[in-house]
Amino acid sequence: MENLAPLYVNHINEQNRRVADVLAREQLEGLAIHSGQYHRQFLDDINYPFKANPHFKAWLPVLDIPNCWILTNGRDKPVLVFYRPVDFWHKVSDVPESFWTEHFEIKLLTKAEKVADLLPKNLDTWAYIGEHLDVADVLGFKNRNPDGVMNYFHWHRSFKTDYELACMREANRVAVAGHNAAREAFYKGASEFEIQQQYLSAIGQGENDVPYGNIIALNQNAAILHYTALEHAAPANRHSFLIDAGASFNGYAADITRTYAFEKNVFDELIKAMDKMQRELVDMMRPGVRFTDLHLATHHKLAQLLLEFGIARGEASDLVEQGVTSVFFPHGLGHMLGLQVHDVAGFAHDERGTHLAAPERHPFLRCTRVLAPRHVLTIEPGFYIIDSLLTELKADGRAEAVNWDMVNTLRPFGGIRIEDNVIVHQERNENMTRDLGLN
């Protein structure tokens, strides 16, 4: 992979520039960015797995340590308050030494409740950035996640630095290794649970390390959009496999989906047609194109596909207008990707947070942005046999538009989704997923 150290220099300079810019605009003196703290399970002494504040992760790859803080004014070297308690119950992390540490003044915190000793004495013009507003109250922050600051950072997080792009390429490389292992396990007859174990082993990450709960769906389970159950027994008849699974690197996410048929049949041909359509949609990405228009184009392409495979009848434009395509493809084409899987600012029109909503008929679209260089998005068209949606379609008079015999033929296969992670450049698109050989 790329040498991160020189890339990080420019990344931290950009972070400092953004802070200085927004502080001047919002008339603030500095930001205190809290990594977060543990959440305890109800009536128990066990904590939920810790997930760091994404605004904290944007600065440095300290991902699993609560009670840390970044203090920054955009001018001076930022301070990292690093939590290192005296604790004989748990492993205590070493003081970090890495490519990024020289860019911070590191102060050690041994007791979380003593952090006030390391904060500025007057917090009137400092803003707290984080989840735990009760902590902010106790410490005396008057400015807590101010809209002007949050909207600014969310907008600018959409434009990835070279360091961030390098991290996302590496996250894709790791995830592709897992996808290859999972595909092999499927064809060898593994259960969903066994495929999941093969995937995690191949990427060297645990269930709490990956950026989201993997979707490992065999047969009809592939029709459940966010299927996260794992059946331990392999199915008696093996028809299809949908895997939506990612990986993390330095806090940045990969989010990749593939679908496979166990045998050569009409479903296999449908996968190939969907794959061709997905590649065409990636080719349509360029600066100045609104993502909403790509999503609408997907519905018109899907309508043609439904007609070609005899799944629907009529005119393609009517299938879109009547919402028939939305029954088979109810989710959005994709979303922003970065520190979060569904990254922020998908609906932002500017750095002030002006909201551009999804079209009324496409409420599950997660992005309405105009594409620009350094944006990273997923492109993930789908096709599913979802009985609850088909029942609604039958009930409201659109049943004649559907070939129910073909629907019944495809039902055991569940559905298809194909998803790549794409960087928008000025003159080209960079499909990180395909570039790594995952076809």
Curated annotation (Swiss-Prot):
It holds the Pfam family Peptidase_M24. The keyword Metal-binding applies. Mn(2+) 2 binds at D244, D255, E419. InterPro entries: Creatin/AminoP/Spt16_N (IPR029149), Creatinase/aminopeptidase-like (IPR036005), PepQ_N (IPR048819), Pept_M24 (IPR000994), Peptidase_M24B_aminopep-P_CS (IPR001131), X-Pro_dipept-like (IPR052433), X_Pro_dipept (IPR022846). Splits dipeptides with a prolyl residue in the C-terminal position. Keywords: Dipeptidase, Hydrolase, Manganese, Metal-binding, Metalloprotease, Protease. Its EC number is 3.4.13.9. It catalyses: Xaa-L-Pro dipeptide + H2O = an L-alpha-amino acid + L-proline. This is Xaa-Pro dipeptidase. HAMAP family: X_Pro_dipeptid. GO terms for molecular function: aminopeptidase activity; metal ion binding; metalloexopeptidase activity; phosphoric triester hydrolase activity; proline dipeptidase activity. Binds 2 manganese ions per subunit. Belongs to the peptidase M24B family. Bacterial-type prolidase subfamily. Its cofactor is Mn(2+). Gene3D superfamilies: Creatinase/methionine aminopeptidase superfamily, Creatinase/prolidase N-terminal domain. Mn(2+) 1 binds at D255, H335, E380, E419. NCBIfam families: PRK13607.1 (NF010133). It comes from Shewanella amazonensis (strain ATCC BAA-1098 / SB2B). PROSITE patterns: PROLINE_PEPTIDASE. One of its GO terms (biological process) is proteolysis. GO terms for cellular component: cytosol.
